[in-house]
């Protein structure tokens, strides 16, 4: 994942004479496809000192809120906008996603204005109900399902680390 030091270096590099107003937002992907998670809490706290919004593509982290075994969601860590692709890590149809907004730095009315311009006037109720069903499943059975999942990951990890090298 991206470290706070890397963010500080980038902000310094792209700010003219340390005028942080040159930077309109920082966009991160966390977790990455490979599962690397950035220190969102520290990064958000640093950026918020300069009124810089943090947008996190948390496509592969929609499950974070549903088990203590997973990292904290970027929403809870203070990111201003977080996008989850629900279908990637939860039982939902492909193309389903959710955008979360933490009020404070971002102009919510501006987002609504653009959202209304670009959203479909014919939303897919099948996709929306898939999100609702998915969230219902993890709300009602998430503890059990994710405990089983974590147990299987632990077993797999042990097997991979104790297997003899193929060479």
Regions found by a protein language model. Name each.
Residues 1-160:
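Conserved PLP-enzyme active-site core in the AAT-like
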Residues 161-166:
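Conserved small/polar residues in nucleotide/adenosyl-binding loops
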């Amino acid at each position: 994942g991206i470290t706070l030091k890397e963010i500080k270096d980038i902000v310094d590099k792209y700010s003219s004479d340390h005028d942080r107003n040159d930077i309109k937002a920082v966009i991160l992907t966390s977790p990455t496809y490979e599962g690397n998670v950035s220190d969102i809490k520290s990064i958000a706290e640093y950026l918020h000192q300069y009124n810089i919004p943090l947008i996190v593509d948390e496509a592969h982290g929609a499950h974070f809120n549903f088990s203590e075994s997973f990292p904290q969601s970027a929403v809870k860590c203070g990111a201003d906008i977080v996008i989850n692709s629900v279908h990637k890590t939860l039982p939902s149809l492909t193309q389903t996603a959710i955008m979360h907004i933490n009020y404070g730095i971002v102009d919510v009315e501006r987002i609504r204005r653009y959202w209304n311009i670009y959203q479909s006037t014919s939303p897919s109720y099948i996709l929306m109900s898939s999100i609702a069903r998915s969230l219902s499943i993890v709300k009602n059975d998430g503890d059990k399902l994710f405990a089983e999942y974590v147990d299987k990951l632990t077993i797999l990890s042990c097997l991979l680390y104790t297997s003899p090298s193929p060479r």
